[in-house]
Amino acid sequence: MSFAENVGRFIGNSVNSVGSVIGDGLKGFNSTQSISSAKQANLLNNLPLPSLDNVLNIGMFGGLASGLLSYRAAKKQNKVMQDIANRQMAFQERMSSTAVRRHVEDLKKAGLNPLLALGGSASTPQGAFYSPVNPMESGLNSAISVADKVFDYQRLAHADFQGRLNSAMSVVQLASAVQDYKRNYGKFGEVAYWFDRYAGKLLPAMLFYLFRKHPVGRAVSAANSGYAVAKGAKGVNFKFSNMSSTAVQRHNSRYNVSKGWRR
């Protein structure tokens, strides 16, 4: 059997062995991935999703209750602040209207002449005020909060639906790709698909490694190394011979029979 036939037989056996190992591994990986994808799809489909009506009812009643309580609290706060301001203004009015009389009484009690109070006059109080609170503001904020919750739920529902759709599309595309390979390349299409996707770049390196470990591969490597050394030695010899012939030519060109050596 020739050297080429040995190399071809070795490569063929290596490819068959590596292909069978990779094919079995990828088939198992494919089965595991299919089972995992199916479980994930079932889990996604069985996830409890609250209904929109329940969310709307909870958000609406909660918002209405919060708005009503805030409205009543604001009205009560306005009433309390108004009562405080009214009592303060009543006190200021009473003090201002009795200022001269109280001054005279104080002078009498002090043993002084009450006529000293004639130069005084009643004061003008500044009054009292409060900052009222708009009771409708709390109700409006509660209504806006309810609307925001509805929109947030719609966004979450859309994102969940999009995620389910993407998962389903990934499974469908994967199954379609495998079926296309099966249909186009026969019973080895599935293995070819996974091999092309995951192991296509590993096979050349594996084959080269196995070839280098085989006796034939070691012989080929040694032959290549010897050829490289011989080629390098031949190049050096050729260069030396060229240098020798050039030196002889220069020597002959400088000598003349009739005139002798030229300087």
Curated annotation (Swiss-Prot):
The keyword rRNA processing does not apply. Probably triggers with protein G the injection of the phage DNA into the host upon conformational changes induced by virus-host receptor interaction. Keywords: Capsid protein, Host-virus interaction, Viral genome ejection through host cell envelope, Viral penetration into host cytoplasm, Virion, Virus entry into host cell. GO terms for biological process: symbiont entry into host cell. One of its GO terms (cellular component) is viral capsid. It comes from Chlamydia phage 1. It is found in: Virion. Belongs to the microviridae H protein family. This is Minor spike protein H. It comes from the Viruses.
